[in-house]
């Protein structure tokens, strides 16, 4: 059986006139649309029912046949087929043109395909097409050249000179069509290849371009003359609707206007031709027809766009596809879905981790069909119709049925913007009164939600498979780790942290200190009877059964710690249980802050898995809220104690500043030095005041507790509250040398307040800009890596990628352990001192093994990496390593490309926008933050370029009056000299030994230079470590593998330099794997292989260079991508996610992969035993 949606690839091509007539159901001859009196379509018009089908279901135009029983009959009076009105969305018409016209995409695009294949300049072509010049089609015996242009005067002169029939020249699309018809593609191809061998420079580039177009036509089976249109397709009327507004006027799609102009001009041209009008009039009409067709296909591409009322350019066919509002992005990639709702969220601290509160009315509407079915099943309603009536009238018994339906049916909750995959999670719904959705406090971090009016959307998974996936893969209790770095995302925040911190504090000299209790229960009783303070240091006797033997002893602790440890598994490894005296100790015997809570959760997850962790989290949440309430931790101005030392510190600094000013006035130091010194002084003073403040705060001071626990606020905020605000920047980002000496507690004066506003306002402006930039970066990253899916277990590569710790100066930015854990080594790792093999090649390394390797003093390790993966499509599981979100090995079918893009894009909003000023005048601005990440991923030439050594050797410095020169002497004694401009900072010293690609001066390096000097591995390394530096400086951890996925996509193309005996064209870009394949085939035949070199593409270019034209067209430059694809007759293999979403198929990832879809289920009931079904505890 042929299913419409069951195909493996999609091809695009040029439509021949025959094809267009074949699609069509009839010719549109009149420009009329709808008769405004009868509101029925005019016959042969743009909405004609005979061509496109009936307006009403099962009803012909004249009303002779009505009802479904006449299905398929064609009315003998009006010629309309009796069928569903839906066919008006799919039936096409056509317009037969009186004169051929050119297709603007192929004539006007860059490069002009028509111009290249004819070897005419686009300007010359334009003159011919728009009737400004004649082109010689056949010079016959005359000295004129073929394709030579003649203006009106020259044409007349030539005719006078050589006679009427002595040569053939014409103008307009007819002439171009004749020329295109005459092209012999095979012959042209051979000739161009011959020419290519001898030509150089600009001429060679032009020949390569022409050859590319000729080969595209030759291989695709498209004919060049199809670029000139004889017949225009008319799209179905329901895709360009016309609706009546109140008041009797009509609103219509712009396309109808554009079609109408084409039909009007075409009919006028036919009439003129029949009348045998003078040439000049006909020519003018043909030109107008050409312009009308241009406007229909792509309005505004040539000349001024055709405008509608109010000077608004009309939306042409191309505009319907382009941009955010176009067909691709608006309707194919982002559809609205049924069974969904949205509402405001409120906090639900009483919920379990996997639950959410769903408002009753909303649930009833969302689960309506399920409730109706259940009502019938339970015998509460006789048929679906009465069940529907019951639900709509909300009868009391409906609620019980709803509870029953909802009990095991998960729902998906989503909060926009969905920046990473944790932006949609599944929950078990619980019915709640009111109209707000209740959300568990621990999932707020993942959603980045708060309860100040945020809204969330609910979606109901309908099929059993969808419900199963939601429950097992998307349940909030299973998504505890962040996919970007594998750290817990469900970490308690704010009150929960404060409560836990409060519980685990201890205090000297409080009630009950030093008491001894017989068991933990007695401690709790004493605490509840207020006989002992929660922070009192007490002793308690504990009993434990370990390996069958009972151990008891006395431990020192506090009631708070006993309470806190009730919810913590006692085997997380914080305490070394092998030591006898530690066997009874409480696991968490320290002050708990947000950071340590993260560690506890991480250890619990690694040791006990998701279910136990989510139970522990719920207990910590409950205790945290309870005890932060009991602790009654509040803020008041009396908690902000201004430190005693502040006045003295300020006076001292002012004296020193005065000294510096004096030195400046006397000319001992320059203006810059003075400024630098003053800034340094005030920075240090602000620090000193802050330190004095922190020292003077009591550990039970509520503000201190909030900051120290990580619940809210930070040291710098406390500094501003009670210390001093310190230095501020002016609007241009330069630091003002007068600091704000007051704190908020003391109050700011007018000038201080005014200076503060600069920073605040700039911050707000920055944030707004940053959000948009960050979103766009994410979109490009998704597009470049969306087809990277884990497609096989092992690609069998022998290669590896060498990693070592990433350093910035002396500071370690990313240690080796982090780079190794969750990876496979590509060769045996051997201990350099003992010579034993620590890890065999292709063995999985967890964190412990990675630590062993690092502790053995090994500095560099070769690991399997996405960079060296040999899978043609996607990556293999071995090269990818561990799945960060589960800390298990990655499964086949995981969409690692999208996860990588989200992991890099999601923290984008946290990166700063500003460019930092380095000290000194001539220090070039170093771009950092988001712009730097973008610069790296787009492989742009950075601002503030560093000078890079092209060779390895020893540094020799020379300084003359005019300039500084650095000479690098290679081992062969060859000298390469570099002139250093004054003001740039030199990174090397005399006598240093440097290698090729090292920086001589400070600044950023152009990645293309690194590719040239150090090769492809060098540039991959550089991009990886540079991007990591930007993120790590902002305290964002991203695992290397995500960056590797994107960088691999940037370095996948090879630029052909010499085609050898292959079919490849020099100067074109081709996928590395296709290149190797082509060479392998040629070598087997004994031919000469092609030569090429890896090209580094920015993410935008790389996304547009993908094999899939659907994915590229839906990304950017839609018309250019489609023009190119159509000429080449490209086939989209539908391997990525985007293209499958566009055509409405399941994505080839996860359970949508063919290997999972084509599983056959054998139902052999006898083999299935009841007790073998594991009960799954949620």
Swiss-Prot record:
This is DNA-directed RNA polymerase subunit beta'. Pfam families: RNA_pol_Rpb1_1, RNA_pol_Rpb1_2, RNA_pol_Rpb1_3, RNA_pol_Rpb1_4, RNA_pol_Rpb1_5. Binds 1 Mg(2+) ion per subunit. InterPro entries: DNA-dir_RpoC_beta_prime, DNA-dir_RpoC_beta_prime_bact, RNA_pol_asu, RNA_pol_N, RNA_pol_Rpb1_1, RNA_pol_Rpb1_3, RNA_pol_Rpb1_3_sf, RNA_pol_Rpb1_4. DNA-dependent RNA polymerase catalyzes the transcription of DNA into RNA using the four ribonucleoside triphosphates as substrates. Keywords: DNA-directed RNA polymerase, Magnesium, Metal-binding, Nucleotidyltransferase, Transcription, Transferase, Zinc. Zn(2+) 1 binds at residues 60, 62, 75, 78. Mg(2+) binds at residues 450, 452, 454. GO terms for molecular function: DNA binding; DNA-directed RNA polymerase activity; magnesium ion binding; zinc ion binding. The RNAP catalytic core consists of 2 alpha, 1 beta, 1 beta' and 1 omega subunit. When a sigma factor is associated with the core the holoenzyme is formed, which can initiate transcription. Its cofactor is Mg(2+); Zn(2+). The keyword Metal-binding applies. It comes from Clostridium botulinum (strain Hall / ATCC 3502 / NCTC 13319 / Type A).
């Amino acid at each position: 059986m042929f299913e419409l949606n069951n195909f493996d690839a999609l091809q695009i091509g040029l439509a021949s006139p025959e094809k267009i007539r074949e699609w069509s159901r009839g010719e549109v001859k009149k420009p009329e649309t709808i008769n405004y009196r009868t509101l029925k379509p005019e016959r042969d018009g743009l909405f004609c029912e005979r061509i496109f089908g009936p307006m009403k279901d099962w009803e012909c135009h004249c009303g002779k046949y009505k009802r479904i029983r006449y299905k398929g009959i064609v009315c003998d009076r009006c010629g309309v087929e009796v069928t569903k009105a839906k066919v008006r969305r799919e039936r096409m018409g056509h317009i037969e043109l009186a004169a051929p016209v050119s297709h603007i995409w192929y004539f006007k695009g860059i490069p002009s395909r028509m111009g290249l294949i004819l070897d005419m300049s686009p300007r010359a072509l334009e003159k011919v097409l728009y009737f400004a010049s004649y082109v010689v089609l056949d010079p016959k015996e005359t000295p004129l050249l073929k394709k030579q242009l003649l203006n009106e005067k020259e044409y007349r002169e030539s005719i006078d000179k050589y006679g009427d029939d002595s040569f053939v020249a014409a103008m307009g699309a007819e002439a171009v069509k004749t020329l295109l018809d005459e092209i012999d593609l095979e012959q042209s191809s051979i000739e161009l290849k011959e020419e290519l061998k001898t030509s150089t420079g600009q001429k060679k580039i032009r020949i390569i371009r022409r050859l590319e177009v000729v080969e595209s036509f030759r291989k695709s089976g498209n004919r060049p003359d199809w670029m000139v249109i004889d017949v225009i397709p008319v799209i179905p009327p329901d895709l360009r609707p016309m609706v009546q507004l109140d008041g009797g006027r009509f609103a219509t799609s712009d396309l109808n206007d554009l079609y109408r102009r084409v039909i009007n001009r075409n009919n006028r041209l036919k009439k003129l031709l029949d009348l045998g009008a003078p040439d000049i009039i006909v020519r003018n009409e043909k030109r107008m027809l050409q312009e009308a067709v241009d406007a229909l296909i792509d309005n505004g591409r040539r000349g001024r766009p055709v405008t509608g009322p109010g000077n608004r350019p009309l939306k042409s066919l191309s505009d319907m596809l382009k941009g955010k509002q176009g067909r691709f992005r608006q309707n194919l990639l982002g559809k609205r879905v049924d069974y969904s709702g949205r509402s405001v969220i409120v906090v639900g601290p009483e919920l379990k981790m996997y639950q959410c509160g769903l408002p009753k009315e909303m649930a009833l509407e969302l689960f309506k069909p399920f409730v109706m079915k259940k009502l019938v099943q339970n015998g509460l309603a006789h048929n679906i119709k009465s069940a529907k009536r019951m639900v709509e009238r909300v009868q009391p018994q409906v609620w019980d049925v709803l509870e029953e339906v909802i009990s095991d049916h998960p729902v998906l909750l989503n909060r926009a913007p969905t920046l990473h995959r944790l932006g949609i999670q599944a929950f078990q719904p619980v019915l709640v009164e009111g109209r707000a959705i209740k959300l568990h406090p621990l999932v707020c971090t993942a959603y980045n939600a708060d309860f100040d009016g945020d809204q969330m959307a609910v979606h109901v998974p309908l099929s059993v498979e969808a419900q199963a996936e939601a429950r097992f893969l998307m349940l909030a209790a299973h998504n505890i780790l962040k996919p970007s770095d594998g750290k817990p995302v469900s970490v308690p925040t704010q009150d929960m942290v404060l409560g836990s911190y409060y519980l685990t504090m201890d205090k000297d000299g409080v009630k009950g200190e030093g008491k001894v209790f017989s068991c933990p229960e007695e401690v709790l009783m004493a605490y509840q009877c207020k006989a002992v303070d929660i922070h009192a240091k007490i002793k308690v006797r504990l009993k434990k059964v370990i390996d069958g033997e009972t151990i008891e002893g006395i431990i020192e602790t506090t009631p708070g710690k006993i309470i806190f440890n009730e919810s913590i598994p006692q085997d997380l490894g914080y305490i070394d249980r092998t030591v006898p005296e530690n066997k009874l100790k409480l696991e968490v015997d320290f002050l708990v802050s947000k950071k340590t809570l993260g560690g506890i959760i991480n250890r619990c997850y690694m040791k006990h898995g998701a279910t136990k962790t989510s139970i522990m989290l719920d207990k910590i949440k409950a205790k945290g809220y309870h005890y932060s309430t009991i602790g009654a931790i509040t803020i008041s101005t009396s908690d902000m104690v201004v430190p005693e030392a502040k006045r003295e510190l300020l006076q001292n600094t002012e004296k020193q500043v005065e000294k510096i000013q004096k030195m400046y006035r006397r000319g001992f130091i320059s203006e810059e030095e003075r400024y630098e010194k003053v800034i340094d002084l005030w920075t240090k003073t602000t620090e000193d005041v802050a330190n004095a403040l922190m020292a003077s705060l009591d550990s039970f001071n509520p503000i201190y507790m909030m900051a120290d626990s990580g619940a809210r606020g930070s040291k710098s905020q406390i500094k501003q509250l009670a210390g001093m605000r310190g230095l501020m920047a002016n609007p241009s980002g330069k630091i003002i040398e007068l600091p704000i000496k007051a704190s908020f507690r003391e109050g700011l004066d007018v000038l201080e307040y005014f200076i503060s506003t600069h920073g605040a306002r700039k911050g707000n402006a920055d944030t707004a800009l940053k959000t948009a930039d960050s979103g766009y970066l994410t979109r490009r990253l998704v597009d470049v890596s969306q087809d990277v899916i884990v497609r096989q277990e092992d690609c069998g590569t022998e290669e590896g990628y060498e990693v070592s710790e990433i350093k910035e100066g002396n500071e370690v930015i990313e240690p080796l352990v982090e780079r190794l854990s969750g990876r496979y080594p590509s060769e045996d790792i051997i201990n350099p001192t003992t010579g034993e093999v620590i890890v065999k090649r292709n063995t999985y390394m967890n964190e412990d093994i990675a630590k062993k390797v690092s502790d053995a003093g090994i500095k560099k390790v070769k690991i399997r990496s996405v960079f060296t993966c040999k899978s043609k499509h996607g990556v293999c599981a071995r090269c990818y390593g561990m799945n960060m979100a589960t800390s298990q090995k990655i499964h086949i079918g995981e969409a690692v490309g999208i996860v990588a893009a989200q992991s890099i894009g999601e923290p984008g909003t946290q990166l700063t926008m500003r460019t930092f000023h380095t000290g000194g005048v001539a220090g070039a601005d170093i771009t950092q933050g988001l712009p730097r990440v973008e610069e790296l991923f787009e492989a742009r030439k950075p601002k503030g370029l560093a000078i890079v050594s092209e060779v390895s050797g020893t540094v020799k410095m020379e300084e003359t009056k005019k300039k500084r020169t650095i000479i690098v002497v290679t081992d062969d004694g060859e000298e390469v000299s570099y002139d250093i401009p004054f003001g740039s900072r030199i990174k090397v010293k005399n006598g240093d030994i440097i290698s090729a690609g090292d920086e001589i001066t400070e600044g950023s390096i152009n990645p293309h230079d690194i590719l040239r000097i150090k090769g492809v591995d060098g540039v991959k390394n550089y991009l990886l470590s540079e991007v990591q530096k930007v993120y790590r400086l902002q305290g964002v951890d991203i695992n290397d593998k995500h960056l590797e996925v994107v960088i691999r996509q940037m370095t996948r193309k090879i630029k052909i330099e010499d085609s050898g005996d292959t079919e490849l064209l020099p100067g074109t870009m081709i996928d590395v794997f296709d290149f190797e394949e082509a060479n392998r085939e040629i070598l087997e035949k004994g031919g000469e292989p092609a030569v090429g070199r890896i090209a580094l593409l920015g993410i935008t270019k790389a996304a547009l260079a993908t094999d899939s034209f659907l994915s590229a067209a839906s990304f950017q430059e839609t018309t250019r991508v489609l023009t190119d694809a159509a000429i080449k007759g490209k086939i989209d293999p539908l391997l990525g996610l985007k293209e499958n979403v566009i055509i409405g198929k399941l994505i080839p990832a996860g359970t949508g992969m063919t290997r999972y879809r084509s599983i056959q289920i054998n139902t052999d009931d006898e083999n299935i035993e009841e007790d073998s079904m594991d009960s799954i505890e949620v």
